[in-house]
């Protein structure tokens, strides 16, 4: 029984682990030379409601990747504007650690293998065609290609290619597997009838910052610097994908987080203006390299799905991560990926597919996003455990807690404890 995962980001890696635990032969096809995709320039875990979701995953038996990010943490339990008890993992260490772990678990990694087309008939995928014209057969497929780029979208809906971590000019464009199967993808919107949204942060080389700022980042994990009044731009907040960070504090201040590099919590920032801020006189971008002029564009290719993560209209295709909804974040990708991988094996076995109830945060987020994405207003929102409208909902429903025993008990009451550890084949 062969599960093929297209895209090796956080969602794809999570899907691979749960499918493997359930007993499948698992293959990941990744177009670049790195796993984790945007996770290589991310780093924020366990902030606000993501803490709850992370502990739910651990209780469900799908906490492997959460534990690896904990292990690679540079800082734990830090606060920054609008966010509490965050963990910041080291983006320069995490990919190698995850890659070693997947190999150790017997997952087959196919790097620099870009999927170019699908062999699709009678509502079923028979195989994939790679860009080197290799044909790959499989039983069930999971699309975790994300929604970022390719270059044409970043040009049409953004400020052009910003030379981000996905490196489309070098490794080729992302394609939508669901669209190649004739499925109409959903597109996220922002104000002014514009599609897509800018990625919400950049990375600065920590070595290019002043000694004071660098030392404070190493010690505390966070530095907040005042933006000169003439350079404050509230309008940029509306273009951000990360609405949990679209707070006025992030327009009035430069917020830096220590994730190995210095994570700059804004979509982009002209370097000449950035260097006017004391301590940043010699600042240099390391992601995206053109962080002065723009950032990658996301949410232009979301597959319609049911709450078991199966793509509507294709009998043997699942989706996860941004491909599966207007979700933001590594934790959200790992949650959806874990469910997709597990259900892929259930489908092969002829079993009922698992749908998480709304009495746990993961189940509620998956169902709530699906419902909201049907409306135009809902497509202008983004869904994350960490903030914006969904974190408020978590608090109102009593789903948000940082008490591990309470979370584990909640999962156990539903008879879902260690469900992802069950071997099905």
Q: For each predicted feature, which ranges?
A:
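N-terminal Rossmann-like FAD-binding beta1-loop-alpha1 element of flavoenzymes
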Residues: 2-27
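Residue-level detector of alpha-helix initiation sites
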Residues: 9-10, 34, 323-324
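Conserved N-terminal/central alpha/beta ligand/cofactor-binding core
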Residues: 18, 24-25, 30-114, 150, ...
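Predominantly flavin-linked oxidoreductase catalytic cores and closely associated redox partners
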Residues: 109-249, 261-273
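FAD-binding beta-loop-beta segment adjacent to the flavin cofactor pocket
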Residues: 242-244, 293-327, 370-382
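A conserved FAD-binding loop/helix module that cradles the flavin
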Residues: 325-345
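Active-site-proximal substrate-binding core of FAD-dependent oxidoreductases
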Residues: 345-382
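C-terminal auxiliary extensions adjacent to catalytic cores
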Residues: 377-425
């Amino acid at each position: 029984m062969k599960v093929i995962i297209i895209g090796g980001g956080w969602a794809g890696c999570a899907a691979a682990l749960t499918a493997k635990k359930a007993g499948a032969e698992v293959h990941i096809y990744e177009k670049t030379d790195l796993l984790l995709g945007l996770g290589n320039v991310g780093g924020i875990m366990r902030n606000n409601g993501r803490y709850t979701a992370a502990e739910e995953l651990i209780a469900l038996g799908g906490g492997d990747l959460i534990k690896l990010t904990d292990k690679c943490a540079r800082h734990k339990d830090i606060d920054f504007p609008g966010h509490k008890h965050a963990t910041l993992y080291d983006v320069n260490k995490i990919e190698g650690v995850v890659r070693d772990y997947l190999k150790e678990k017997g997952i087959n990694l196919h790097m620099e293998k870009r999927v170019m087309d699908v062999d699709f008939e009678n509502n079923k995928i028979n195989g994939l065609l790679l860009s080197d014209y290799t044909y790959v057969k499989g039983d069930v497929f999971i699309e975790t290609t994300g929604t970022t780029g390719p270059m044409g979208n970043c040009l049409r809906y953004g400020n052009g290619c910003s030379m981000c971590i996905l490196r489309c000019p070098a490794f080729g464009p992302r394609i939508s597997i669901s669209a190649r199967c004739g499925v109409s993808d959903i597109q996220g919107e922002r104000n002014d009838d514009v599609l897509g949204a800018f990625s919400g942060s950049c990375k600065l080389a920590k070595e290019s910052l002043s000694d004071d700022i660098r030392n404070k980042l190493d010690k505390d994990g966070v530095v907040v610097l005042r933006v000169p009044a003439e350079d404050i731009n509230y309008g940029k907040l509306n273009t951000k994908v990360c609405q949990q960070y679209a707070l006025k504090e992030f327009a009035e201040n430069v917020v830096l987080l220590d994730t190995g590099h210095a994570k700059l919590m804004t979509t982009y920032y002209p370097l000449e203006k950035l260097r006017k801020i004391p301590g940043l006189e010699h600042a240099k971008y390391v992601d995206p390299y053109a962080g002065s002029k723009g950032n990658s564009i996301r949410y232009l290719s979301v597959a319609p799905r049911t709450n078991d993560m199966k793509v509507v209209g294709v009998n043997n295709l699942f989706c996860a991560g941004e491909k599966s909804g207007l979700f933001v974040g590594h934790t959200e990708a790992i949650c959806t990926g874990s469910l997709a991988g597990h259900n892929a094996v259930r489908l092969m076995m002829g079993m009922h597919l698992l749908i998480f109830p709304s009495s746990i945060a993961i189940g509620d987020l998956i169902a709530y996003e699906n419902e909201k994405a049907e409306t135009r207003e809902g497509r202008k929102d983004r869904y994350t455990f960490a903030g914006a409208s969904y974190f408020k909902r978590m608090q109102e429903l009593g789903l948000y807690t940082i008490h591990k025993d309470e979370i584990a008990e909640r999962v156990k009451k539903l008879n879902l404890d260690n469900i992802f550890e069950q071997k099905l084949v």
